[in-house]
């Protein structure tokens, strides 16, 4: 066997391994994982935002800038976890993947793995978002 094809085969297998090491989380598993919790996400190694999950599938998303959005989540027929927010009525559907390192990745439908949101922390502390329609 020539060295170049062997190297190409090795590189192909090495790049495919991380994808094989991730498991898609079902909607039921997702509900058990997030209900009553706040997940903090990183993108490209930097803090990106956090989402608080309530018993009735309501959510509050907060960008690191502090901008908060309220919404709901549901599973679509493809098994993706979809979110609809008050400020954006179009569903945003994600696959949640569990890695061998125990961290979860959220991948927007049809986006490359490079744009994944990665859980930095799963806790129970509520987000600091004001209630809607409250004056100052």
Feature locations, PLM:
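Positively charged n-region of N-terminal signal peptides that target proteins for export
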Residues: 1-5
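Bacterial N-terminal signal peptides
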Residues: 6-15
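Lipid interaction determinants
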Residues: 17-72, 78-136
């Amino acid at each position: 066997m020539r060295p170049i094809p062997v190297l190409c085969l090795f590189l192909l297998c090495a790049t495919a391994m991380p994808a094989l090491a991730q498991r898609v989380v079902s909607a039921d598993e997702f509900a058990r994982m997030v209900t009553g919790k706040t997940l903090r996400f990183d993108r490209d190694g930097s803090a990106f935002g956090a989402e608080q999950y309530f018993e009735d599938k309501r959510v509050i998303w907060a960008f690191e800038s502090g901008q908060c959005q309220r919404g709901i989540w549901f599973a679509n027929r493809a098994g993706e976890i979809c979110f609809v927010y008050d400020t954006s009525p179009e569903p945003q559907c994600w696959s949640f993947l569990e890695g061998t390192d125990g961290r979860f990745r959220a991948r927007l439908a049809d986006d490359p793995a490079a744009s994944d949101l990665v859980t930095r922390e799963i806790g129970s502390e509520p987000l600091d978002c004001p209630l809607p329609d409250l004056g100052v």
